[in-house]
Structures are given as C-alpha cells and as structure tokens.
C-alpha cells in the first residue's frame, strides 16, 4: 500500500468523523442556546464532506483503493468521540470544547500525513486541506472564547 493510499484512508476516516461531529453539534446548537453558531458548524460539516470526496476521487484517479469505510487505526483514534457525549447535554461551551478536541485531532492527522512520502499532487491537496482545517479549528476556538 502506498503512502498516499494509507494517508488517504486515515484522512477520509477523520474527515467523516468531523463531518458527523460538526453536523451533530450544529443540530444541538440550532435547538439550544446558540442557534447562530449552527450555520458555522453546518458549513464546516459540509467542508469535511467535500474534503473527503476530494481525497477519495484523487485516490481513485491514482489507482489507489481508498476504502471508504476507513481504517482500524483511525477508528481507534476518533477525535470526535467526545462530541458524541457532549451533544447529549445542553451546554454550548461543552459542545464547542468537544469540537475543538476533534479539530485538534484532525490537525494532528493532517500533520502525520504530511510527514509521509506523498506524491506531489496528493501532498498539494493535503497541504491545502490542512490549512483549511487549522483555520476551522481557530474559528471554533474563537466561538468558544465568546461563550
């Protein structure tokens, strides 16, 4: 398995976790005490879905078998698991705190991917997405500081 394929599988799993986590957080905040933040989190959920599709499509273009069900390693290290617990409560601060934890995990996964010997085209996509994930984490942290 190529480094591109390994990284793609791990990133797709992380992105799917983020997509689901942001969607759940948006739903919770829409119904809770911070509905104005829901649109931001929904947008980030949609961004993660787009990033996942982009990586899957690129992997297929390179002939890699990007298993869309994810990897065992990624499944064991899901940064968004904390969000599942936080979403059961009503505290917007807890929901955002869990989102930041998930984003810290996503940033870490992108940094691990960038340490691998990736092909030039895949590295360009991963680098661009990494920058967007860092910006998203900062955006969620900014919301958290308002709470």
Language-model segments: residues:
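Carboxylate-rich helix-loop segments that flank metal/cofactor sites and access channels
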Residues: 57-97, 101-107
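A structural signal for well-ordered alpha-helices, especially hydrophobic packing surfaces
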Residues: 19, 26, 52, 59, ...
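Alpha-helical bundle segments that constitute or directly flank the non-heme di-iron/ferroxidase center
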Residues: 2-32, 94-117
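Preference for long, well-ordered alpha-helical segments
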Residues: 95, 99-147
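Conserved alpha-helical segments that form or flank metal/cofactor-binding pockets of metalloenzymes
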Residues: 36-73, 140-143
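Short, functional N-terminal and low-complexity linear motifs
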Residues: 20-25, 46-49, 72-80
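Alpha-helical scaffold segments that form or flank carboxylate-/histidine-based iron centers
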Residues: 3-14, 33-53, 92-96, 121-135
């Amino acid at each position: 398995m190529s480094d591109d394929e390994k990284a793609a599988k791990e990133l797709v799993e992380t992105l799917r976790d983020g997509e689901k986590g942001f969607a759940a957080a948006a739903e919770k905040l829409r119904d809770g005490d911070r509905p104005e933040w829901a649109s931001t989190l929904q947008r980030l959920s949609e961004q993660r879905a787009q990033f996942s599709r982009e990586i899957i499509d690129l992997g297929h273009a390179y002939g890699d078998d990007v298993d869309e069900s994810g990897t065992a390693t990624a499944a064991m290290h899901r940064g968004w698991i904390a969000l599942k617990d936080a979403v059961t409560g009503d505290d917007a601060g807890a929901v955002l705190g869990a989102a930041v934890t998930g984003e810290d995990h996503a940033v870490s996964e992108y940094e691990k991917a960038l340490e691998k010997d990736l092909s030039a085209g895949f590295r360009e996509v991963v680098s661009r997405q990494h920058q967007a994930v860092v910006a998203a984490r900062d955006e969620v942290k900014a919301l958290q500081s308002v709470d």
